Amino acid sequence: PRRLYYAYDKDVYANQDVDDEFLKSLAEGGFQVGEFAKLCYGIGADNNVKTLEPADAVRQTKELLSLENVNIAEAAFLVGNMFVRADIIEKKGDVINLIEVKAKSWNPLEDTFVSKNGKSTNKAIRPYLYDVAFQKYVLVQALKEMFPEKNFKVNAFLMLADKSKTATVNGLNQLFKIKSAPQKRSVVEVSPDAGDIVSS
């Protein structure tokens, strides 16, 4: 949440890591995973809130949420000074699923959310749980303001890469090519074949 706040006031909070190649490569992997998740949820350009302007992003999100059933990428929610962008929102009637997509790999056969002593959360996953919990909190409060007459049931999920599984498609990552953009932020070019492969 803090990074997102700073990102919108670049004149005051300059990003010192903008030219760090290692951080850039990590971010690019995250972009690829994000695009893959959009395909998994059938999200096209019309349901992808791309604007970086917070007020406009919130307005677009509200318009999309007025539909009975919809999947949205990069939905925006603002309450007071708390602002979040949700990777994926899946709305089915009055049920809203918040899906936070992470490039982190995870083995459900070996890894757990609970530490070995069973008394706290696993340190490796804790920041992701805090992130999705904060997003859910803001989402629930924002929905009360956006749609005061509605009573939504909100669920929150983490979407992680399952490293216990083998990909059924060779070169899956090649369907999501990283391209440099003029503003120094990389973009992902999704192969036209990617949708067919993901849906099969």
Which stretches of residues belong to each language-model region?
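Mg2+/Mn2+-dependent nuclease catalytic core
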Residues: 66-200
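Metal-dependent nuclease catalytic cores that hydrolyze phosphodiester bonds in DNA/RNA
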Residues: 1-96, 168
